[in-house]
Amino acid sequence: FSQSAFPNSHHTSSSFSSFLEKFSEPSYSDILKMICPITLYYNYHKKYNFGNLHLNTRYYGKTYSATDSDLSEEAQRLLKLIPNEKDQRNAAQKHTYSRLIYQRRNKIAHEFYAVGLSLNFQEDRENQLPHIVLSHEFIGEDLIPGHWELNIPEQFTTSVFLSAIKGYLSYCEQNQILPFKPESERAYRFSWYDK
């Protein structure tokens, strides 16, 4: 569906994330457009000398939901430390939750990545949202903060996909367009040839 909805996109990742952001329910779409400061930090901290994250590390099991304002503020602070405006835009785009879901999809589909992560849900929450957790480890008898981990619960991903598909099909019905490209234009038919 994403390639049919965004046929002029030169990158599958762009059409995938644009599809999710445009056609899923607004409550999901808003989250998908947010930038994850954790993946941004770990990807660029050495290159741009970010220093430390400005998140609370005092509490064992500290969890931040994707909608937490502290995460948005930290993402914006980190982006401002990237000197080039074009690099800022590229970094921001690569670390939206929609793009991170695409990256996870690729790891599973193309690299046969096992999703055997630690528990990736938040207790006592009906709606599971992406969140980050500070891991800890014991050194002797001391509990030492480790690194931050991003968790995108399966329930969230499934809900986003179903919402986007439903939104896209509704859009196609309202605008009287076929949801798929004509078979003769599908990219897989030309995969044997150079363009």
Name every feature range the model reports, one short phrase each.
Residues 5-18, 118-121:
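Short acidic alpha-helical/loop segments enriched in Asp/Glu that coordinate divalent cations
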Residues 11-14, 36, 54-55, 59, ...:
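Alpha-helical structural elements
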Residues 1-8, 102:
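Short, hydrophobic, well-ordered secondary-structure elements
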Residues 5-8, 28-30, 48-53, 131-139, ...:
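Short, charged low-complexity intrinsically disordered segments located at boundaries
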Residues 20-107, 111-118:
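Short, mixed-charge amphipathic alpha-helical segments
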Residues 73, 77-195:
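Polyanionic, low-complexity intrinsically disordered segments
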Residues 17-21, 39-46, 145-160:
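Short, surface-exposed, charge-dense and proline/glycine-enriched linear segments
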Residues 11-18, 22-30, 62, 168, ...:
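Hydrophobic, well-ordered secondary-structure segments
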